[in-house]
């Protein structure tokens, strides 16, 4: 979207990837410097509101979620507000728990819309980028989500569009993917483990995956998985193994998908249209890592949409009460049932589910979006 380049050139090969030198899987990094290539907003007076890879971006105004972390393991939820608009004072605290997790819903999107409208009116940027996440939630929870969610995000978008028109700006709507119904999960790392290719370490907090000691493992991201190999001579063996697994549509070389980047896996697995990849690598839930039952987007070695669900409200209320009383505890309320997930994305699908641009003389191909914005900016 921002560069007009393919992932092979801009380097963002997924929501996370394996860092080979440190032998760590890193998910949901936010440094803008991870994006390789010129972004269309460089050299333009820009406001970036909750856009991904927002930290340290070369823009004049921005806001992004970022908790404070204490040395005792405590966490205080907050945002980085670099808008000079004092957003929390005017709008109240950002509703972090509705941004992601079992309570993810409308309040976070409404707050972002209101914040963006305020920045538009007060700062009048040449360009503003605003991410409204609301449709990501129920369209992953359910195969047939209520269309009320569309009407809700439409009202939030209206808040931003009204503010844009007040400063004579042109509103553009862009979506990088469409969520499709799914009915089955493929635990690709369990397949690799059962074949003796994936290594784990057992300990007091469950089994931990050891990427650096594994012959093969997968970093999963919705319907796509990067498969990393310790030795590329294993390529044919692993490809045959995974292609024989139910729910896997294809296993290809990254160059075939414009993913030929140093951060990419040695193979790319694609799910069937009605399937998605779970990151699960343990073979018995009794030995699942302690973070598996929590919302922990940075520690999990793969994307986990089960974080949108909850085991039971009673258990969650008990954990909240324990936290308020000062007990040291973990919020282990996330189910280990990948079959709950109702929607996913990542494949090239029908036109109804592909990337979308709405605006005057909008391009049909998403790779033309950066060039389109530059043209609107007169660059």
Report each predicted region and the residues it spans.
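Short glycine-rich loop/turn motifs that provide flexible caps or phosphate-binding loops at active sites
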Residues: 3, 10, 177, 195, ...
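Secreted, luminal/periplasmic, and some membrane-associated catalytic domains
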Residues: 15-33, 37, 141, 159-337
């Amino acid at each position: 979207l921002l560069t007009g380049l393919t992932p092979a050139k801009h380097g963002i090969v997924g929501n996370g990837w394996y860092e080979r030198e440190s032998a760590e899987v890193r998910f949901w990094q936010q440094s803008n410097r991870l994006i390789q290539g010129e972004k269309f907003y460089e050299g333009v007076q820009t406001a970036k509101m909750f856009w991904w890879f927002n930290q340290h971006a070369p823009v004049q105004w921005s806001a992004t979620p970022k908790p404070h972390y204490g040395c005792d393991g405590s966490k205080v939820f907050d945002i980085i507000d670099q808008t000079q608009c004092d957003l929390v004072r005017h709008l109240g605290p950002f509703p972090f728990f509705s941004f992601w997790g079992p309570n993810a819903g409308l309040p976070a999107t409404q707050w972002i819309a209101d914040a963006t409208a305020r920045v538009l009116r007060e700062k009048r940027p040449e360009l503003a980028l605003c991410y409204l996440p609301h449709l990501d939630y129920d369209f992953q929870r359910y195969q047939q989500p209520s269309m009320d969610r569309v009407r809700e995000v439409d009202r939030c978008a209206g808040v931003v569009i009204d503010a844009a028109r007040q400063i004579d700006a042109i509103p553009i709507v862009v979506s990088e993917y469409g969520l499709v119904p799914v009915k089955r999960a493929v635990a690709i790392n369990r397949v690799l483990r059962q074949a003796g290719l994936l290594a784990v370490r057992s300990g007091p907090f469950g089994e931990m995956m050891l990427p650096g000691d594994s012959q093969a493992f997968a970093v999963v991201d919705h319907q796509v998985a990067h498969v990393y190999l310790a030795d590329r001579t294993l390529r044919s063996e692993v490809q045959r193994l995974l292609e024989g697994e139910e729910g896997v549509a294809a296993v290809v070389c990254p160059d075939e998908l414009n993913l030929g980047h140093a951060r990419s896996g040695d193979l790319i697995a694609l799910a069937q249209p009605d399937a998605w990849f779970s990151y699960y690598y343990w073979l018995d839930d009794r030995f699942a890592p302690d973070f598996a039952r929590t919302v922990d987007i940075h520690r999990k070695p793969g994307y986990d949409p089960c974080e949108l669900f909850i085991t039971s409200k009673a258990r969650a209320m008990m954990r909240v009460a324990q936290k308020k009383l000062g007990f040291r505890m973990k919020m282990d309320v996330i189910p280990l049932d990948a079959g709950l997930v109702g929607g996913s994305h990542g494949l090239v699908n029908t036109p109804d589910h592909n990337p979308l641009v709405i605006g005057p003389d909008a391009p049909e191909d998403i790779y033309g979006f950066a060039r389109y914005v530059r043209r609107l900016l007169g660059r």
